[in-house]
Amino acid sequence: MSKAKFERSKPHVNIGTIGHVDHGKTTLTAAITTVLAQAGGAEAFKYDEIDKAPEEKERGITINTAHVEYETANRHYAHVDCPGHADYVKNMITGAAQMDGAILVCSAADGPMPQTREHILLSSRVGVDHIVVFLNKADMVDDEELLELVEMEVRELLSEYNFPGDDIPVIKGSALVALENPTDEAATACIRELMDAVDSYIPTPERATDKPFLMPVEDVFTITGRGTVATGRVERGVLHVGDEVEVIGLTEERRKTVVTGIEMFRKLLDEAQAGDNIGALLRGIQRTDIERGQVLAQVGTINPHKKFVGQVYVLKKEEGGRHTPFFDGYRPQFYFRTTDVTGSIKLPEGMEMVMPGDHIDMEVELITEIAMDEGLRFAIREGGRTVGSGVVTSIIE
């Protein structure tokens, strides 16, 4: 059978399976591809193909993730599944594989377990706002009341972390039975029901081009007789010649300027959009007024901050991280977008130290402002090597 070409006209959504080890995340991923393959919407993957996920490096951190893609009648999905718990923690904090929503897999026979809780907590921290629940192994539970009890427990757990526990779709079924009987209507009904829920409950994400313009400044130079040019890759939004933008970060001052020219690959453009590497010619800006580490942004859409709370994963020794713990008041460099800024760390109350391999919430105070909003990723570096990776979960000031 020849491979069907994926239709790219459908909206694209990134999702992933989360949940406790051995509750059936990988089996479910295999079942989804196998059932959808019947309708020509996927290439069927076997359990082993997903389980032996290749290692990837994201900011120097090794993460095992399996990527599969499939489509429903309404959407095209990229789906990520991580074999190990540590891989989930690292993936979610570094944002290696972006997730717009998640399928929480929980074994109906065991109920919520420690990693069920941990993955829900992580999702709430890193901005995975929409979760659909699949109560797996439901065929192993004979007692209907017990099933209802587990569903209630999962809903309460979700509510505890500010998810709308009462409204979240919960689908019961068996991923294994569906995987082994992909042509059996009854066995695969739970998979179709799950994908219908994912289709309707997880919203289509806002495209990067629809967001307010932002470009991290990578380099600055002067064109004699024309003015100052800032170069970088547009992170989000669209920029037109004649737009007013602000230069933000590394100082309290916000400097406004008008973009009088946009250049890409030595050609002049009228507009640039997310993903483009450009040079922007800025009116009335001196070479000394702007530097790497600042951002150009649509006026009034982002602010410079010094103090924030971050969820951080601390690299293990084997990953090239520190060999020893660090303590309250530790002062490493925080790498945001294109620059390092020194900052000091305040550990949560009652925590003496942080060991390599831990993931924690920490309060950080930088020595200078950086343009930031919630969800911004950063690396923690010490003498040029990465010792941690984090995401801004809330801004203090």
Curated annotation (Swiss-Prot):
InterPro entries, alphabetized: EF-Tu_GTP-bd, EF-Tu_GTPase, EFTu-like_2, EFTU_2, G_TR_CS, P-loop_NTPase, Small_GTP-bd, T_Tr_GTP-bd_dom
Specify where the region named G5 lies, as residue ranges. Answer: 174-176
Main localisation: cytoplasm
Q: Where is this region: G1?
A: 19-26
Amino acids binding GTP:
19-26, 81-85, 136-139
> What is the annotated localization of this protein?
Cytoplasm
Q: Which GO terms describe its cellular component?
A: cytosol
Q: Which residues form the tr-type G domain?
A: 10-206
Q: Describe its partners and assembly state.
A: Monomer.
**What is the name of the protein in this document?**
Elongation factor Tu
Source organism: Clostridium perfringens (strain 13 / Type A)
